[in-house]
UniProtKB/Swiss-Prot annotation:
Pfam families according to UniProt: Ribosomal_S18
The protein's assembly and partners: Part of the 30S ribosomal subunit. Forms a tight heterodimer with protein bS6.
Name the record gives this protein: Small ribosomal subunit protein bS18
Key words of the record: Ribonucleoprotein, Ribosomal protein, RNA-binding, rRNA-binding
Length: 81
């Protein structure tokens, strides 16, 4: 048995995404900004979890509150049919 001289592969490193609402020119979370809120709602109308969107815990709470306010005021639908 001969061992081939292949270099060892580096393990795949998934880069940690940064929060889209933190930073200098980050958008403000506002319940009236329907276009921004729709990016964080699934095609079924559910709020997308922060592990997928990479939103920080604090901003995820603000985002959820803004989405719920916009739903209550009928700016965005509760369910998408």
């Amino acid at each position: 048995m001969s061992t081939s001289a292949q270099p060892a592969r580096r393990p795949f490193f998934r880069r940690r995404k940064t929060c889209p609402f933190s930073g200098a020119n980050a958008p403000k979370i506002d319940y009236k900004d329907v276009k921004l809120l729709q990016r964080y709602i699934s095609e079924r109308g559910k709020i997308v979890p922060s592990r997928i969107t990479a939103v920080s815990a604090k901003k995820q709470r603000e985002l959820a509150r803004a989405i719920k306010r916009a739903r209550f005021l009928a700016l965005i639908p509760y369910v998408i049919s």
